[in-house]
Amino acid sequence: MLSALARPAGAALRRSFSTSAQNNAKVAVLGASGGIGQPLSLLLKNSPLVSRLTLYDIAHTPGVAADLSHIETRANVKGYLGPEQLPDCLKGCDVVVIPAGVPRKPGMTRDDLFNTNATIVATLTAACAQHCPEAMVCIIANPVNSTIPITAEVFKKHGVYNPNKIFGVTTLDIVRANTFVAELKGLDPARVNVPVIGGHAGKTIIPLISQCTPKVDFPQDQLATLTGRIQEAGTEVVKAKAGAGSATLSMAYAGARFVFSLVDAMNGKEGVVECSFVQSKETECTYFSTPLLLGKKGLEKNLGIGKITPFEEKMIAEAIPELKASIKKGEDFVKNMK
């Protein structure tokens, strides 16, 4: 059942460039001038699914918006600069994507970003709760394992929390898993789908290779190496960029893929499945990423973990303590805010 549904969204990204799709989504990008924000905004501007694109940052947004506005696609683009302009950026939005925050540098974990990015995410999501409480909120800012609990607690404080509308974007883990499996097996990566569950950092990233479509088999040593590469792929890019940033282009692609899937589902397309880090009852963690069936109102049905191998069970068991700690850290941050 799941594998039949779960041929997600490489197709959504391709379809988003066709002109037959409905063009009505009002999308805001918060952190639009950054390394992820600029290429993400370009991909969104290029899609006929988007009718209005509002860009926010604390620097350079008028320039980014002016540049993008010259592209011959239908989305109307406007830039907003600084906190006093944020409410206008958010009004009437259907989807808000938040890549804002500082990137990783060599030697840093995603968790090292916590102190800076926690404040940024709490501030931006408070504005969302006030000015577009009904919008879908897609969090890219790391550490996602903590920034999603932060977002949820902020929305609860404002009395507008809806767990079906807040998503931690883990799509890059799926994109990487698909790519690496395809490389090893000589397959077309656009036709490979590996569900990745758990969280979005290190060993909390759990690729379910046993559920890959098409079915693939690896010897245990190769499976362990492949899993490790998927888990540490972000660090691979940070090292390769040698201090010049983290994964920006692939993250922008993955973020756009998730947004297009979400908008497709909001437009009434059926059978749209993406993995995302959301409030969950699938494990003892209050948030957990699994394949989700998306619908007109966001998360329609959590499709759960499904049948897994002992190797995958062990990875889940090992990830849960770290995930619980990251979730608590995010929740405590909001509870202790002045």
UniProtKB/Swiss-Prot annotation:
Substrate binds at R104, R110, N142, R176. GO terms for cellular component: membrane; mitochondrial inner membrane; mitochondrial matrix; mitochondrion; myelin sheath. Acetylation is enhanced after treatment either with trichostin A (TCA) or with nicotinamide (NAM) with the appearance of tri- and tetraacetylations. Glucose also increases acetylation. Acetylation of Lys-239 and Lys-314 is observed in liver mitochondria from fasted mice but not from fed mice. Gene3D superfamilies: Lactate dehydrogenase/glycoside hydrolase, family 4, C-terminal, NAD(P)-binding Rossmann-like Domain. The keyword 4Fe-4S does not apply. InterPro entries: L-lactate/malate_DH, Lactate/malate_DH_C, Lactate/malate_DH_N, Lactate_DH/Glyco_Ohase_4_C, Malate_DH_AS, Malate_DH_type1, NAD(P)-bd_dom_sf. It is found in: Mitochondrion matrix. It holds the Pfam family Ldh_1_N. Glycans are attached at S33. One of its GO terms (biological process) is aerobic respiration. Homodimer. Belongs to the LDH/MDH superfamily. MDH type 1 family. This is Malate dehydrogenase, mitochondrial. It comes from Mus musculus. The lineage of its organism: Eukaryota, Metazoa, Chordata, Craniata, Vertebrata.
